[in-house]
């Protein structure tokens, strides 16, 4: 065998797939293409590559295309969207090199340094059961902290991690920002040290009765000026949060999140979510996954409503073959925008996946 080809087979891996979603609303419509529509849809193929050029070093790249219709959050009907896969107008219908970064492990894998381009949520607020809208829950508040997610973007970054003692992992991260929630924006490659995102996270990963778990405490600062909700002037964006996941049996896991964000600049100063993930719930369907979760977003009292928007979601991911999956998903939103007098919104969705 040719040595070059043998080296590539050993050091390079490729993965890819395509996800398609169709979501139907009840008691809600959005204006799209000049008409009121009661549905949204999305299709998103991607290609991922990992190359290990040196020992304990890896280069990761992800190319993704997403085409979607508008959703409820984009039209200001809910505080958090019901289809997290959707992207905004800037990226809709474009092929994007979302991630391209290098990671070098150090000190016998007790530390690492990473740099390149990715989103902060590659490292922050992760969760074993509620973190991937392509395979798990689909609504934003059961995928990430919505306020962190709204500030998050794919941009140049540097991250440092260390494991000082067993089961404790520490991380610091700095990232260029386009100032996504400011009245004026900049390019992510322009003045990268100008009011960047800074974040830190501590993760405790114990084994409880032989079952893996992760308990994360994180904080972040978006250092550009945000318009104040409480009066004239500006303040920095910041937030702190917990993201927890714990296997309790071989096939059942629990998760929870809670976050507090600067109440002077964000529509949602408090957020929480809890849920369960079960493999093989149906007899003889060991590779299927069932998920059930509930989340709450407390509306800021300085906005028109001050109630709590509640999201309930259930999905069942059916394995048809090694490469094909299909997932019916149901969501219900109580008190949209924190308005206790508003009619609830029901959404049913079907997701199809092909992966290789």
Model regions: which residues?
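Beta-barrel outer-membrane channel/assembly domains of diderm bacteria
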Residues: 1-111, 160, 317-318, 325-333, ...
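Long, well-ordered mid-to-C-terminal structural blocks that present hydrophobic/aromatic surfaces
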Residues: 207-284
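Residues on the lipid-exposed face of transmembrane beta-strands in outer-membrane beta-barrel proteins
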Residues: 45-51, 99-104, 115, 158-162, ...
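Transmembrane beta-barrel strands of outer-membrane/channel proteins
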Residues: 16-22, 61-65, 113-117, 172-176, ...
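Repeated loop/turn-to-beta-strand initiation elements of outer-membrane beta-barrel proteins
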Residues: 12, 55-59, 109-113, 166-172, ...
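Surface-exposed coil loops of outer-membrane beta-barrel proteins
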Residues: 72-101, 108-197, 201
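Residues that define the transmembrane beta-barrel architecture of outer-membrane proteins
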Residues: 24, 35-43, 93-98, 152-156, ...
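Outer-membrane beta-barrel biogenesis signature
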Residues: 1-15, 34, 119-133, 142, ...
């Amino acid at each position: 065998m040719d040595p070059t080809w043998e080296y590539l087979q050993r050091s390079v891996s490729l993965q890819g797939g395509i996800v398609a979603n169709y979501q139907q609303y009840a008691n809600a419509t959005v204006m799209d293409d000049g008409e009121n529509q009661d549905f949204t849809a999305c299709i998103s193929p991607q290609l991922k590559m990992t190359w290990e050029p040196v020992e304990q070093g890896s280069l990761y790249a992800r190319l993704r295309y997403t085409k979607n219709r508008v959703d409820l959050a984009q039209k200001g009907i809910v505080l958090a969207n019901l289809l997290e896969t959707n992207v905004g107008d800037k990226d809709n219908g474009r092929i994007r090199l979302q991630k391209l970064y290098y990671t070098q492990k150090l000190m016998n894998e007790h530390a690492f340094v990473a740099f390149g381009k990715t989103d902060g949520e590659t490292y922050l607020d992760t969760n074993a059961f509620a973190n991937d809208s392509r395979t798990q829950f689909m609504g934003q508040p059961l995928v990430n902290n919505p306020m962190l997610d709204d500030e998050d973007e794919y941009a140049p970054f540097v991250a440092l991690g260390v494991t000082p003692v067993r089961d404790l992992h520490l991380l610091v991260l700095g990232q260029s920002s386009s100032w996504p929630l400011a009245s004026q924006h900049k390019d992510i490659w322009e003045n990268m040290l100008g009011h960047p995102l800074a974040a830190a996270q501590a993760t405790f990963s114990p084994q409880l009765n032989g079952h893996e778990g992760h308990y994360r405490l994180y904080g972040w600062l978006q250092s550009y000026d945000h318009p104040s909700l409480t009066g004239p002037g500006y303040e920095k964006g910041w937030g702190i949060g917990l993201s927890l996941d714990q296997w309790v049996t071989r096939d059942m896991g629990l998760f929870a999140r809670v976050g507090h964000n600067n109440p002077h600049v964000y529509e949602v100063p408090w957020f929480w979510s809890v849920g369960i993930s079960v493999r093989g719930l149906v007899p003889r369907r060991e590779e299927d996954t069932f998920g059930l979760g509930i989340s709450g977003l407390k509306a800021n009292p300085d906005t028109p409503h001050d109630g709590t928007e509640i999201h309930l979601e259930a999905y069942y991911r059916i394995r048809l073959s090694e490469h094909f999956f299909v997932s019916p998903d149901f969501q219900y939103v109580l008190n949209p925008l924190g308005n206790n007098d508003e009619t609830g919104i029901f959404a049913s969705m079907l997701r199809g996946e092909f992966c290789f």
